[in-house]
Regions:
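Alpha-helical scaffold segments
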Residues: 1-376
Length: 376
């Protein structure tokens, strides 16, 4: 009886009772709740969940209780502010965190803490919560988590906060459907970027591209399909001749020559040619203007089997080749080459989580992609 009366008092609006009187009633209620049954605490939590200004101490006590008690407060209570939710995230159970992760209109600070403390199930719930605001640093954390937990990839790719840097990294461990979604959304034309930087090429050429940062940026922006200087230096002369040589006798030298003629670094080529799925090879071939017969010759030169099975890597490669426009394939290839090679540091491999937040996007991408086993 006393518990019910006190619940009625603390549930009164502040137009009927002073805040101080209600808080004192709440202090007494806390002691009764600690000694009361779970059913009593559930009833109280259900009642307080509908109040916008329920007594804070009582609300926090019940919100940290067993999830059977805490659920309505964690799901609905507007009396719990971001600070309260962060505290609960840090101190309560995984079940509490999963309920909070599904809460409407979560702010970035709460989401950050959930990403730090949450298990894979919590992260999955969080990614599916379209009303949650996810910061760029937490997106970085979620992308890293998706490397080792494939169930996170699909909901991650649906987030509006996902950037090209994130997407083109996730590509390497996404499945076939995920890769198609990435290419459809992020493989865009660079027309505006190319036009805005068109006058920079002759200026940089006057200095023989001495500024390394500018040179690497222009390598991403440039429109050329192949590296003419590399073709002039190569003993093969053309990309097609290099592919023929690789088909006859593959070795590291000719594979590197193919990379240079394509305008990419060997580290990028190794990632592309070693990709089990096939789509990466298709992107390279389309970007450099390789005809269909030489696409298959390159595939064979890499000692990859040609199969009619629609689910085979060869058919996945062929589908991607036929689906992509040249300009869009160039965007992806150039971005990969810039991201994987412009700030590559072997000491970062396997240590993406340890990099400083101020590390360049390219350095983070290289550590993330090159520092893990390949899978599709």
């Amino acid at each position: 009886m006393m518990l019910r009366r006190l619940c009625e008092v603390v549930s009164m609006p502040l137009t009927r009772i002073s805040r101080h009187e209600r808080d004192m009633a709440g202090d007494i209620l806390i002691e009764l709740l600690k000694l009361g049954s779970a059913a009593m605490r559930q009833q109280t939590a259900q009642r307080l969940a509908a109040l916008a200004d329920s007594p804070k101490r009582v609300t926090l006590l019940l919100a940290r209780d067993d999830v059977s008690v805490a659920r309505p407060l964690l799901e609905e209570s507007t009396a719990l502010n971001d600070s309260d939710l962060i505290h609960i995230t840090q101190t309560a159970s995984s079940a509490h965190r999963r309920i909070i992760a599904a809460r409407k209109n979560l702010g970035e600070a709460v989401v950050d803490m959930l990403a730090i403390h949450g298990d894979v199930q919590t992260l999955s719930v969080l990614l599916l919560n379209t009303t949650a605001s996810i910061s760029i640093t937490t997106m970085d954390r979620l992308v890293r988590a998706s490397r080792d937990h494939a169930t996170l990839v699909a909901p991650l790719l649906r987030r509006q906060e996902l950037t090209p840097a994130h997407a083109f990294a996730v590509f390497w461990w996404a499945d076939e459907d995920g890769r198609r979604a990435i290419l459809k959304r992020f493989a865009v034309d660079r027309a505006v970027l190319i036009a805005s930087a068109s006058d920079m090429f002759p200026i940089a050429a006057e200095d023989n591209f001495a500024d390394a940062v500018v040179r690497k940026a222009l390598q991403y922006i440039e429109r050329r399909q192949r590296n003419r200087a590399a073709m002039a230096r190569s003993p093969y002369g053309t990309l097609e001749a290099a592919i023929d040589a690789a088909l006859a006798k593959p070795d590291l030298f000719v594979i590197n020559e193919i990379a240079y003629i394509c305008g990419i670094k060997p580290v990028t080529a190794a990632q592309i040619f070693g990709d089990a799925g096939g789509e990466a090879v298709a992107i390279l071939c389309k970007a450099v203007g390789l005809k269909r017969d030489y696409v298959e010759r390159l595939w064979r030169a890499l000692r990859r089997p040609v199969s009619p099975d629609p689910a085979s890597p060869f058919q996945r490669m062929a589908f991607a080749y036929d689906s992509l426009a040249v300009a869009k394939a160039q965007t992806v290839l150039r971005y990969w080459n810039w991201a994987l090679s412009s700030d590559f540091n072997r000491n970062d491999l396997g240590k993406a989580e340890e990099l400083d937040e101020d590390a360049s996007v390219a350095r983070q991408a290289a550590a993330l992609v090159l520092g893990r086993p390949k899978r599709v």
